[in-house]
Amino acid sequence: MIKSELVARLAQANPHLYQRDVERIVSTIFDEISAALARGDRVELRGFGAFSVKSRPARTGRNPRTGEPVHVDEKSVPFFKTGKELRERLNNADIADDKLMVDDSDDGDD
């Protein structure tokens, strides 16, 4: 699924929202996650997973064409660890279909 497909599915599941508003919301979420990671923060979405940044040390690699050693600088890379609920859902044999599932059970009337 690409970003435009995500926006279209969310807009379809929420007909009270305009697609352009959904697109702004999705873009803002991605921008905020990116900004938090750039600051070195961890972003946790309970039940889904956590985004963090890991540091890869400098090392000596090899040029695949020549076999010649090359220096690879230290770098930071994004890392995603799945949450327990997502892992269970992915490993559950009775995943019904490809529909977007929205949990409307908690409507805040408790």
Curated annotation (Swiss-Prot):
Signal peptide: none annotated. SMART domains: BHL. CDD domains: IHF_B (cd13836). InterPro entries: Hist_DNA-bd, Histone-like_DNA-bd_CS, IHF-like_DNA-bd_dom_sf, IHF_beta. Belongs to the bacterial histone-like protein family. Heterodimer of an alpha and a beta chain. This is Integration host factor subunit beta. It comes from Parvibaculum lavamentivorans (strain DS-1 / DSM 13023 / NCIMB 13966). The gene is ihfB.
